[in-house]
Amino acid sequence: MIFGAITNSWREQLPTHTVKELVGAAVEKGAKHIELRQTCLGECESGAGDDWRPNLDELQSVVEAYPSLTFDLAMALPCLTQTIDPVGDMFQAALAGAKLVGGAQPHLRVVDPAPVEGPWSSPSDIPEEALGLAGLATEAARQGVIMSMENSSLPIRNMAMLVEQVRSMVPEAAGAGLGLCPDPTNQLRRFPDSDPLAELDALPLDMIKLVHFKQ
């Protein structure tokens, strides 16, 4: 397992430090991977919401400064509650950023921060907007980008149900590139009586693209 850090851990330090400096501090503590998280990228981003864009020149500078590290790009994307245009400027900019920082294995990690009614009992409960992931996953795969989703307001098992449903709707290669970034702590906040570690353990290995651990 490769351990690393997420830039939103440095929210308080970002006003007085560059992302490049903070990544260097993480490297000194043994980090091998860095998740570059929207809203916590300092000089490496501009705008907010639909107008958010990664600053590709600054991201390239960070990646070139630490060639031994691997990186993924992470963003909030309301892909479960809204229909996102796969060829729209926002998603295309995110894919460009993921390809720039990801090297041989570009990875875009997304999370829908909006509340989602759940948990779901069966695939028939999945809202139509969430099935729009098929178009996003297909476009990401076309550009060679792995796409993973973090669970926010749904349990891990429901996110797995969604991935399985979307995989059945797209070509095999596109489906293989779509997976999860499980966060057991997120699940406990919403469903305190659930067992997120058991749900994580039950996931097929090819569905796990990244795992978040936090206190």
What are these regions (language model features)?
Residues 38-43, 112-117, 187-188:
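Conserved radical SAM core fold
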Residues 5, 11, 16-17, 33-34, ...:
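Acidic/histidine-rich catalytic cores of soluble enzymes
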Residues 18, 49-57, 87-93, 122-133, ...:
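Charged helix-capping and loop-helix junction motifs
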Residues 72-78, 113-115, 154-156:
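Substrate-binding cleft and catalytic face of glycoside hydrolase catalytic domains
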Residues 98-122, 143-153:
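Active-site groove signature of glycoside hydrolases
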Residues 1-99, 103-104, 141, 160, ...:
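N-terminal pre-domain/capping segments
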